[in-house]
Regions:
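Glycine-enriched, solvent-exposed interface loops adjoining structured elements
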Residues: 1-225
Length: 225
């Protein structure tokens, strides 16, 4: 389902073709996308990015589309046949501050934490920053695997959700639409139930089926009596 089809379905289900309602449809869809991406960790919406740590600087900026961390690794001898990956352990800021209290505690980073937004010239950035422990002793290459916010189907025209699991987009958007229209409570409840059903199926796929196989987890069995 692309955005044109989704928009038409929302108008058809609600039987509302008013221009003001139509102008809010992008908001209905984007609110649904945000709810879904913060509820289900979809493997297909994960990417990796490499960057370079600055020597004697314990901070690293997160990508602009960052949602959450999957893994982070420091790569020594990057680009050679002797690359060495050191996967960092996620800790909280207090731990890193206590374990490595001064910038002079340098070495190959072993830990990281989400520090918070960076501040430059009294202006707070909207993007998060990571803190490393110990402070990098050199300009090591770092590889970040992370879940990201994809471009909305509203602006892109298509999306992974629209192509692979559109019920969650449709019913989530309808829920927002009926709330906007101040619809009957039983109607909103029915749409909410359909949305939760679709979300549960997507969560089963993203957080379950795509993280196991028959070799390690065994085949799924239904008890027969």
């Amino acid at each position: 389902m692309n955005y044109t089809e989704l928009k038409a379905a929302i108008q058809s289900y609600t039987e509302n073709y008013e221009s003001e309602f139509e102008s809010y449809i992008p908001t209905f869809v984007q609110q649904t996308e945000t709810r879904v991406y913060n509820t289900v960790q979809i493997p297909s919406l994960r990417r990796n990015q490499t960057g370079t740590l600055t020597s004697n600087n314990k901070y690293l900026s997160a990508p602009g589309d960052f949602l959450s961390v999957y893994s982070m690794a420091v790569i020594q001898n990057y680009g050679s046949s002797n690359e060495v990956y050191t996967y960092l352990l996620n800790k909280d800021v207090n731990y890193i501050r206590e374990a490595y209290p001064t910038p002079n505690d340098t070495g190959v980073p072993a830990y990281y934490a989400i520090f918070g937004p960076s501040v430059s010239s009294n202006v707070t950035s909207n993007e998060l920053t990571f803190i490393m422990g110990p402070t990098p002793a050199a300009g090591y290459t770092v590889e970040l695997h992370y879940y990201y916010y994809p471009q909305s189907i509203v602006t892109a025209g298509t999306s992974w959700l629209g192509d692979n699991y559109d019920p969650v987009l449709l019913y989530g958007s309808l829920r927002e639409a009926y709330l906007y229209m101040k619809g009957e409570q039983d109607l909103i409840a029915n749409v909410e139930a359909k949305y939760n059903e679709a979300l549960g199926q997507l969560k089963r796929l993203g957080d379950g089926m795509e993280r196991q196989d028959a070799y390690r987890s065994g085949q799924t069995r239904v008890r027969v009596t």
